[in-house]
Structures are given as C-alpha cells and as structure tokens.
Swiss-Prot record:
Membrane topology: Peripheral membrane protein
Tissue: Ubiquitous. Most prevalent in testis.
Protein name in UniProt: DNA-directed RNA polymerase III subunit RPC9
Upper taxonomic lineage: Eukaryota, Metazoa, Chordata, Craniata, Vertebrata
Organism expressing this protein natively: Homo sapiens (Human)
Listed PANTHER family: CALCITONIN GENE-RELATED PEPTIDE-RECEPTOR COMPONENT PROTEIN (PTHR15561), DNA-DIRECTED RNA POLYMERASE III SUBUNIT RPC9 (PTHR15561:SF0)
Amino acid sequence: MEVKDANSALLSNYEVFQLLTDLKEQRKESGKNKHSSGQQNLNTITYETLKYISKTPCRHQSPEIVREFLTALKSHKLTKAEKLQLLNHRPVTAVEIQLMVEESEERLTEEQIEALLHTVTSILPAEPEAEQKKNTNSNVAMDEEDPA
C-alpha cells in the first residue's frame, strides 16, 4: 500500500460515521439506485463500514462531546494519533491506555494514567448495553451478598 498524501487529516470514527450516514441519507432523498459497478462497490463499502462502526462507542458521541474530550486532553502530552485512538476506542482500563499510548511507561505515571482513564470514562459516553450489563451484574452481586 502506498501513502498518497501524508499530510491528510485524521478522521475519528465519529466523523466517518456522520459522513457515511449523511451520504446514505442524501442517496435516499435523491432516489438514485445502483447503476454502475463502481456505485455498487461504494454502496457495499458504505454499508459494511456503517455496520462495523455502529457497534463502536462513536455511535453515542456528538461534536460537543468530541470537542470537550479534546479540550480535556490538552493537559496530557499526547500525540494526535494517541488522542484519536482514545476517542475511537474509549478504553476503560489502565492496560488499554498503556497499549494506546506509545512508551507509556516512560511518559506517564500511574496517577496520570488514572487521570486519563477518568477523563475518558467521564466524558465519552459508554455503550448503553455495557452500562446495563454493569448495573445488572452489580445487582446480582448485591443479591448474593444479602440472602435475606
């Protein structure tokens, strides 16, 4: 694979999701059907990408959340690529953050990792299904502790 333009901007999963969703809506409104094989390929790529991306945390993000998140990360000395990974993947453990931040052992203390983790989990929305599972599991644990 060859890099055509190394200065191209990086896009978050949220931006790709919004772009493809808008493109899909425009096609519906214009009523254009699949005519050429190129158009069919584009439709397939759009469909598969939306299918994958809609299962990620970006589905619950908004421009305001992204802006707030990036502003909160200014105090951490992270590269653009690292910020993008944190935004796209919404890590919930210190290990996940250490995997996303290059040379994290040298660059970040445990306190900084915990602060970064708190920033990620407090600003970026969680998957509703994950929250429900978490609540269900904690209720089950409470029921097991209280045999009354």
